[in-house]
């Protein structure tokens, strides 16, 4: 893979930034693609652009605002609260998001001569999102290959690891401080450690605390 090119689905968050650093080590050339689906915080797109610029990565932003029209949810509508009732999908789930993002990323990848697509979806911490499952990604990979007659390979470096191991991976990639300080995971639009209260921040902090404890234990 060292001589090949990849496109990273990139939001500027912890997971996709870790995947970006992973891709930079795996491939000769890397591009990033971010999707504007009228998410609550436009800062997400700005954050992604700033990270890509700092790392010298070509960055494309695609307009996916149609998603907001089709699938109202807590990530795009300020009048919808962020909730997760037992047995139901979280209000932050955007119907069809990863299906569309990966499909459009594949179209872009083919246009720029890349066959590798990298995404930060994770089944371990998938929070009830059906489009973060390994079975979905593998199925879509086959569908994309058939639909465009092109040998795409979708990579999911985080699929089987939890948030603590995601922090560990960023550390192994030499990107721990960068990811901690410059990424945007918070649903309330606060870069770095975030608000500490939304589900995304709580998951991120729990993973960070666990990893830091493990790292200190290993040094002892």
Curated annotation (Swiss-Prot):
Specify whether Magnesium is a keyword of the entry: no
Q: In which pathway does it act?
A: Purine metabolism; 7-cyano-7-deazaguanine biosynthesis
- Quote the cofactor binding remark: Binds 1 zinc ion per subunit.
Pfam families per the UniProt record, alphabetical: QueC
Needed cofactors: Zn(2+)
Question: GO biological process annotations for this chain's record?
Answer: queuosine biosynthetic process
Q: What is its EC number?
A: 6.3.4.20
- What family classification does the UniProt entry report for this protein? Belongs to the QueC family.
Read off the HAMAP family from this record: QueC
Q: What is this protein called?
A: 7-cyano-7-deazaguanine synthase
- Could you tell me the gene encoding this protein? queC
